[in-house]
Amino acid sequence: MTSKKHIGNFIIIVWIIFLTCITLVASHAISARINDYRAASDDYKAPQIISIDPEDMPFHTDVFFGTYLNRISRLSMKESNFDADFYIWFKWKGNNVSPGEDFQVVSGQVNSKQLQAELHEGDDHYEQYQVTASITKPFDVMLFPFDDHNLTIKIEDSLYSIYELKYIPENSQDVRISPEINIPGYRVKSLDPISELHRYSTDFGSPWKDTVPSVYSQIVFGIGIARDGLGIYFKLFQSLFVAVAVAMLGFFLKPDYAPRFVVGVGALFAAVANYYNILSMQPIVGYITLADSINLIGILTILLFLIQSSISFYMFDYQGKKELSWRFDKYSAVIFIIFYMFINWWIVVIASH
């Protein structure tokens, strides 16, 4: 009798160690993946340094610019684009360039462009435009729903390269975005307008080999958005959490009671349905997002519950070890609840900081 009891205790201990290892491995893997992703993102965002010899552009025109983002009228991560309404103005000297007439939106299209004001006095020129544009933006949703993004608008001259036109940001403006900009579920911050060089990996078949027109001065401005609190997290996964909680109730049912397995299978279908709902909110990507991982953890938890129920049923019905089955259920219930809450808490802590 003592030997059988020791075997039963050994089975429970092995099961607890197994669940502990799964929890620790999953927690470490997810946190390492998040940290590696952020490190890689920082390297990717590092500005590319493009050197231009000033002697190669002795006759370029300096064009001073300013921007004011009025609103983001539409944002779709699923479709990888957004619409913006903004003001942009240019100041320059001379008649060699026409920045207001020739500018274009990189990776997007201008839907409307209206000249709001202009002043031309001798060589001094000023033009102000109101523009609405649609911009293509491949959103990186690796950390969804704890993701943040920069909604940037990039402006280039469609005719003149850096050798003829150079954008220079004005520093006289403190407010660069409308205080009425509101994107539900996100905090909004202003990004300082900058001018940078954009190199195209082609010479466009240019016959002028001495001055290759593949480097352009580029205006970059916009806003940064970050998730506002944990509201979206709980909204996305409340169905999943309820499904897991319902499955946990099965621990309090007798192993040979058929509805115990029905509860687990029903919870599994609910978790899978929630996963399809999450997939419908994300763009089609070739990697597993954080939301995918959270949902897969819930599905795995329910699957492990069904495995545990099968083992407990075998102990209870086939071996007649009702007391061992009861202890197995009791310890499993405590371990499942603690470990599932821990791994979700760990994900929130790592992803939100």
Model-derived regions, located:
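Short, Lys/Arg-rich N-terminal segment immediately upstream of the first membrane anchor
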Residues: M1-G8, E323-R327
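Alpha-helical hydrophobic membrane-insertion segments
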Residues: H6, I13, I30, Y331-V334, ...
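Hydrophobic membrane-insertion alpha-helices, especially the h-region
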Residues: F10-S27
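Acidic, low-complexity intrinsically disordered regions
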Residues: I11, I88, F204, K322, ...
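Soluble non-transmembrane domains of integral membrane proteins
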Residues: A26-V220, G224
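Membrane-helix interface motif
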Residues: R33-I34, I278, S352-H353
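Channel- or pocket-lining gating/hinge segments that regulate access to a cavity or pore
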Residues: V220-F339, W345
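Juxtamembrane boundary at the C-terminal end of a transmembrane helix
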Residues: W345-H353
